[in-house]
Every structure is written in C-alpha cells, then in structure tokens.
Amino acid sequence: MKILYSLRRFYHVETLFNGTFVLAGRDQETTGFAWWAGNARLINLSGKLLGAHVAHAGLIVFWAGAMNLFEVAHFVPEKPMYEQGLILLPHLATLGWGVGPGGEVLDTFPYFVSGVLHLISSAVLGFGGIYHALLGPETLEESFPFFGYVWKDRNKMTTILGIHLILLGLGAFLLVLKALYFGGVYDTWAPGGGDVRKITNLTLSPGVIFGYLLKSPFGGEGWIVSVDDLEDIIGGHVWLGSICVLGGIWHILTKPFAWARRAFVWSGEAYLSYSLAALSVFGFIACCFVWFNNTAYPSEFYGPTGPEASQAQAFTFLVRDQRLGANVGSAQGPTGLGKYLMRSPTGEVIFGGETMRFWDLRAPWLEPLRGPNGLDLSRLKKDIQPWQERRSAEYMTHAPLGSLNSVGGVATEINAVNYVSPRSWLATSHFVLGFFFFVGHLWHAGRARAAAAGFEKGIDRDLEPVLYMTPLN
C-alpha cells in the first residue's frame, strides 16, 4: 500500500485482507475507508452518495409497498385490524380510506392501490439509485453545480436544509388537504362510535396550538401527546407546514449568522449526527404518541391503549354487577375504597380498584357517561348504550400487553386471545429505534467534534501514565 499523505487520517480503518479488491474512487486507498464502512467511502463523491441515498429510498418504499400488499392479502374483514397484527392498514384507515362508521372496513381496494403505487415508485427510485451508483457522474459539482456541494460550505448546507424543510412542510399540508377537501379523515370521536368526516372548523389559535408545547409531560397534562380532537391535529399541521415552508425559504435566502457558524461543526459527519439526534427525538415522541393517544391512533384500528383496556375492564364489571343488583355507587372494595366508583385527588368520580391510576383516560365510549364532576351516577344507571358495553368488553380482552412470541393480553384474563397489539409493536420499535439513533448521534457527534478539533485518535498514547510506571513483572 502506498504511504498516504498522513496515516493518522486513517487510524480508524482496518487493513483489508484482500488488497486487490478495488472499486475506482471507492477503495480503501483513495478514501481511507474499507468496503464495509459503506457510505463513508462516498463522503467526497456527491454523485455516488446521491445514488446510495436514492437506492436507500427505493428500499424503504419497496418495503412499504410489499408489506402493504402482504397485509391486504392476509386481511380478514370479520376481525378487527388490531387482532391481525397489521401496522400499515391502520394508518391508511386512519386517513379515512376504505372505512365507514365504527371503523368498519367497507373496501380494501384503496389499500391495494396504495401498495401498488409504492411498488411502482420503488422501481423508479431503485433504477435511479443504480444509475447514480454505477453510471452517473462521480461528483455533481462540475456538471450540475446546483446539486453539487462541499460539506464545509455553510451557505450551501443551509440552502439544502431549507429545501428539506419546504418538502416537509408540503408533506404536512398533504394531510391538511386530505382532511379538508379529499374525503376527510377517520374521527374516533364522531357521535355513535366513530366515522370518516371532513374537518371544517380548524383550530388555528396559536394559544391553543402552542399551548400543547407548554403543557407538562406528566399525568393528565401529557404535553402534545394529550391532543384529543382532530381540529387541533389538523390545525397543528397547518401551523407546522407553514413554519417549515417559511423556515425553508428563510434558510435558502440567508447565510448562517456568526454565532451559528461558531456554534456548529460544519462537516458531513456532524450533519449526520444532527440528523440522528432529530430522528431520535421523533422516535421517542412517536413511541409516546402511539402508546397513549387514541385520537391520532384510533383504538378501532390499533386496539385500545393500556389505560383504555384497564378502564374498559372496570366498566364491563360495573355493568355486569349493576345488572345483578349491586349498588355501584356505594359498594365498598377490599381496601375500604369504593369497589366500582371512588373520587380522584381533585374530587371527580372515577372508576375504583386498580384502574384508579388511569383515571385521566379519555375515550369515545366513556365520555358520554361523564358529567361536570366526573362519572355521572345517574347516567351509569340509566344511559349506558349497548355499543358502549360491546366496545368495552372487546377492549378489556385486547390490552396492549404481550411478548415477542405472541402470548398477549392480561396474564390473568381468561377471555384474552393469543394476540399482541400493534400499539405494543409500534411503541416498542420506535422506542428502541429512538434509543439506537441517540447512541448513533453520540458516536458521530463525538467523532465529528474530534475531527474538528484536530485529533481523531482520542488521547495521545505518548502521555499515557502507564508508560511511566514500573512493569508488573
């Protein structure tokens, strides 16, 4: 191997077993990275890096299309989606495609169309990825300067950031358009047990929208995860889309200020670390959203939330025992608290028993039975509808608890089914992904800062204290 200008630059690269394995411009000698370091070989080859990213997008979209069609092929209309291990169809159903009152699936054709569109798109992206990886120009700076870049060119980097923000903003507006003009979205709070409806009365008040960001993340507050009506969700997307588009235009038109130039490390690996940090935050927020929120993730499709299944059990047995003659207003439980009903710390009437800890649950099947001071005893005695009983009995036996081998539900529940809730899968997977992306952020941020500071080896081994100590032998 030729001696390179500085071996220190390549301290982190292992020697190849087969030194003859060469890809022009992508081998260890010219890039300092071996084949297994993947896209690190392409740091300075913008054309090839474009190919890698387009091909990666193709793989993602291919998975979406193939998995979509797989779920359509296995879908059984007689069973709820959450009993079939589906994670993609619930998202399409939430957008109002193919479903009617109560979340009943009326037509699976829109789901089929979605899968086919994603497959076709993935073929286009796959072709583009292969073209740019193998045939296209290695670098874009000469032939297509608009698409070329140098990592340390701060102005170009913020322009690229701006373009990304505009695309994200347009994505947020797509949901707004779907909800307002193209058939509406599924609203679990629609009267009578949920339905697809157009959103007409958007919440655009900044006090309401940004109030969510200022709420405590704990208990009944629940930060943005506590959002429980579609007007606020769609209105929030109007705000988010506008902020992203305006921020994108701002970043395209301006150069970074001096404080920003000083504060950030301006290198490819630094941008990777910033992106990983952002994705990590997204993952953790998505985890909490899918676990606790039954408006953006309707229980008709994703199954009940944990608190919802617990409250449903208390409600189901209250209904049963009330029919058998129990006085649910005054019956005492084994601890001396109310067996069926008790008071919360703030005085509302809530369900008694172990489910007391979930007293701030809000769910469409339960809210009609609340009055100004919590659960209304007279409504519980006279106004319970059959659909509320059916839904709570169903949710009681489908708690989002379960293990990887699909032994799901409450361990002591004799009526539970062999089932793992999509909420469990989606929340767990996004927590794990969020965690690993955070570790990736720390790793790449540390390397980027070290490179910027001019040392990549870590501590200088010449000054190791152990070198000055008496040998053990």
UniProtKB/Swiss-Prot annotation:
Localization in the cell: Plastid, Chloroplast thylakoid membrane
Highest taxon of the lineage: Eukaryota
Pro-peptide positions on chain: 1-14
Transmembrane regions: 69-93, 134-155, 178-200, 255-275, 291-312, 447-471
Classification via SUPFAM superfamilies: Photosystem II antenna protein-like
Signal peptide: none
Assigned keywords, A-Z: Acetylation, Chlorophyll, Chloroplast, Chromophore, Manganese, Membrane, Metal-binding, Phosphoprotein, Photosynthesis, Photosystem II, Plastid, Thylakoid, Transmembrane, Transmembrane helix
One of the record's GO cellular component terms: chloroplast thylakoid membrane
Presence of the UniProt keyword S-adenosyl-L-methionine in the record: no
Residues binding [CaMn4O5] cluster, per UniProt: E367
Membrane topology type: Multi-pass membrane protein
Residues recorded with modification Phosphothreonine: T15
GO molecular function, one term: chlorophyll binding
Entry's cofactor comment: Binds multiple chlorophylls and provides some of the ligands for the Ca-4Mn-5O cluster of the oxygen-evolving complex. It may also provide a ligand for a Cl- that is required for oxygen evolution. PSII binds additional chlorophylls, carotenoids and specific lipids.
BP term (GO), one: photosynthetic electron transport in photosystem II
Major location category of this protein: plastid
Disulfide topology: none
Complex and partners: PSII is composed of 1 copy each of membrane proteins PsbA, PsbB, PsbC, PsbD, PsbE, PsbF, PsbH, PsbI, PsbJ, PsbK, PsbL, PsbM, PsbT, PsbX, PsbY, PsbZ, Psb30/Ycf12, at least 3 peripheral proteins of the oxygen-evolving complex and a large number of cofactors. It forms dimeric complexes.
The family this protein is said to belong to: Belongs to the PsbB/PsbC family. PsbC subfamily.
Function: One of the components of the core complex of photosystem II (PSII). It binds chlorophyll and helps catalyze the primary light-induced photochemical processes of PSII. PSII is a light-driven water:plastoquinone oxidoreductase, using light energy to abstract electrons from H(2)O, generating O(2) and a proton gradient subsequently used for ATP formation.
Name of the protein in its database record: Photosystem II CP43 reaction center protein
Biological source species: Saccharum hybrid (Sugarcane)
Taxonomic placement: Eukaryota, Viridiplantae, Streptophyta, Embryophyta, Tracheophyta
Name of the gene encoding the protein in the UniProt record: psbC
